[in-house]
Amino acid sequence: MAMEQFESVFTAKENAEIAKEFTRLKDTCYLDHAGTTLYADSQIRAVGDCLTGSLFCNPHTSRTTEDLLDQVRFRVLRHFGTHPSEYGLVFTSGTTGALKLVAECFDFGDEGAFVYTRDNHTSVLGMRAVVGTERIVPIGREDLRGGRSTGGGKSSLVVFPAQCNFNGFKYPLGLVEDIQRNGLVGFDGDRFHVCLDAASFVSTNALDLAKHQPSFVCLSFYKIFGFPTGLGALLVHRSAQNLLKKRYYGGGTVKIAMAGRNFHVKRDSLADQFEDGTVPFTSIISLLQGFETLERLVPASGELSSIDRVSRHTFALGRYCFQRLRGLRHANSNSVVKLYHDTEFEDRGSQGGIVNFNVLHEDGSFVGFAEVAYMASVHNVVLRTGCFCNPGACQRLLELTDEDVLKQFNAGHVCGDANDLIGGQPTGSVRVSFGYMSRREDVDRLVEMVEKCYVKKMTANGLTRKQIVSNYKNYDQPKLKMICLFPIKSCGAYKITTSWPLCHKGLKHDREFVIVDENGVAMTQKKLVEMCLIKPKIDIKTNTLILTHPAMENFTLSMEPLSNESQSIKLCQTKVCQDNVQAIDCGDAVANWISIALQTSGLRLLKQSDDEARTLRKSTTEIALSNQAQFLLINQASVRWLADLVPDWDDLSQEPTLESLVDRFRGNLIIDSVKPLEESSWTQLRIGPLEFSVDGPCSRCQMICIDQSSGTRTAEPLRTIAREFKGKMRFGIYLSHVKSLEGSDEKLLHCGSPLQVVAE
């Protein structure tokens, strides 16, 4: 196949039928199938029809349900080319649950060894904490090869993935027979059993257990079908099932258990012994619809099974993506991406449909993965960043020593955070992956996003904060120009040019309300961009909240406090920035108005309970429903500076005004000064008689790419911020009110008041 070409494995008709199943994606480009693939619309409808059309009792009650579960077991085993005489199947909560079960139950006897490859999933590393042996040995991939054992020896266990979830490298499955027959190099006195982590592999590949027969296989079904979640399996070869010594027993797993005497007898079958309590039987039954849907949308063709065709399709997309990204060049001919792979995508037998990379600036320095994730979100591209719960592969491919990893941890980086660059070196990477519903257009969207955001570079070099400040010699005292209030979290601003009172949480009535969906989840413009069109106003005299929207009549809501004991109110729970918040439902009338305005059913408006208090992390300062702090300060001079650096507002017909750009940053206190970015050095300041401490810089996200007057999404100014500050997307500073000047009881902020820097 020629470079950068893609030939579809599926027919035009098959592609069309598949596309009909995923219309809910709309304009979203989904590229995280290694995280979870997507369920088809007809699959979920079929599950619903099955559950509503039949009566499924507890399998401990109904023989019919129990028999159906056995049929599902047969179907799963058939998918993997085996049958109950060869393998027993234990349903678990997922791959992690299956691995934990093996770790807890495997009988190592007298000093057997637990061996694992370093590029295993974290769930395998966690096995070290519970295995019944002290001989725990990590090995490199290159050391995973058969030895010269003659049989017998200590019962030992080796765990490796069929496919690395970091970059899609496939381990040769012939190693299974070699190791189980001949042992491992360097472990002459051990008889090894293989535990295969198949979660990543089976999502898009055929695992033939008639050909390769590891003692244990662990997998999750949502990786294959997208639904149900929370369900996996442990497949145990019949020759190895006596090696699992289970101690705990739950309901349904014993023939007899006596309450007064410590006596019990386990059931005979593997599943009956290991499936404690009632299994998730409705989820298990829904696997039948998963198999049916997959085989209907991707039918077998000739000697190729459904999953074989999926494997060919995802590999072809992965190779096309790999080649396109590798071909990107900056104007100076430097590469735009650094790829983290162990193959060149030559062979489907050694490589799956996963591509892993980091983006590079034209000078060769790294772009942080958090920045790439933000920009992808702006372009409606869903991808995964970080280390993907595979610290070993991450460390090896990013060429980090143990000391480097510990240094990053001591610098504040933890798994799952956005601390993407430390000392200029990446702490993780970007991963894209493909499923049977992925298309060539998805790869093109990804590459277009990378080109648009990182290849089109300005010729001017970015300046450091210190250089910028030193270029401005004239100094005028900054002034408070405007106060912006956001009564409803993530809706439009109520702009004040006179004065406004403070309370113990910040500006009075700031982010006092929140819109939630029918599940009680707080809504933001990231999910529902049209929220910016709701512009609340506050009438202090009547103590009312007035909601405005360009397509709606105004709605007036009383803000008079209600007692939590009142029979007319409904207390609710929602979550804001990982904090559980108690709030009061504002009623059906305003809920209906908001649902119509935002064209989304089931929305509710909640008001933070008057006696509810959130506090800043590592502080006792109280805040309302704001994300991070009491106040966010934005300097108009900094916004002007930033606007001048934006090379092209190619998403808009004309450049935005300064006011509209300031609005994007959603600050509470808008100041103006001569020096752009001077606020970044402040630690204490005073506005009029009120003193504030600086809590730190504001980390920006894709919210600033939303035009607050129209809801239009753009790539700027986030792209320019990321470039100028070397991937650290910070703009504006957080403040907390400390005190008023001695002799002053005033708690009012006045627009026009001078701003005095107390400490830097």
Curated annotation (Swiss-Prot):
One of its GO terms (molecular function) is lyase activity. Residues 608-758 form the MOSC domain. Gene3D superfamilies: Aspartate Aminotransferase, domain 1, Type I PLP-dependent aspartate aminotransferase-like (Major domain). The active site is at 389. GO terms for biological process: Mo-molybdopterin cofactor biosynthetic process; molybdopterin cofactor metabolic process. InterPro entries: Aminotrans_V_dom, AMP-binding_CS, MoCF_Sase_C, MoCo_sulfurase, MOCOS_middle, PyrdxlP-dep_Trfase, PyrdxlP-dep_Trfase_major, PyrdxlP-dep_Trfase_small. It catalyses: Mo-molybdopterin + L-cysteine + AH2 = thio-Mo-molybdopterin + L-alanine + A + H2O. It comes from the Eukaryota. Its cofactor is pyridoxal 5'-phosphate. It is an enzyme of class 2 (transferase). Disulfide bonds: none annotated. The modification N6-(pyridoxal phosphate)lysine is found at residue 223. Keywords: Molybdenum cofactor biosynthesis, Pyridoxal phosphate, Transferase. Its EC number is 2.8.1.9. Belongs to the class-V pyridoxal-phosphate-dependent aminotransferase family. MOCOS subfamily. Sulfurates the molybdenum cofactor. Sulfation of molybdenum is essential for xanthine dehydrogenase (XDH) and aldehyde oxidase (ADO) enzymes in which molybdenum cofactor is liganded by 1 oxygen and 1 sulfur atom in active form. This is Molybdenum cofactor sulfurase 2.
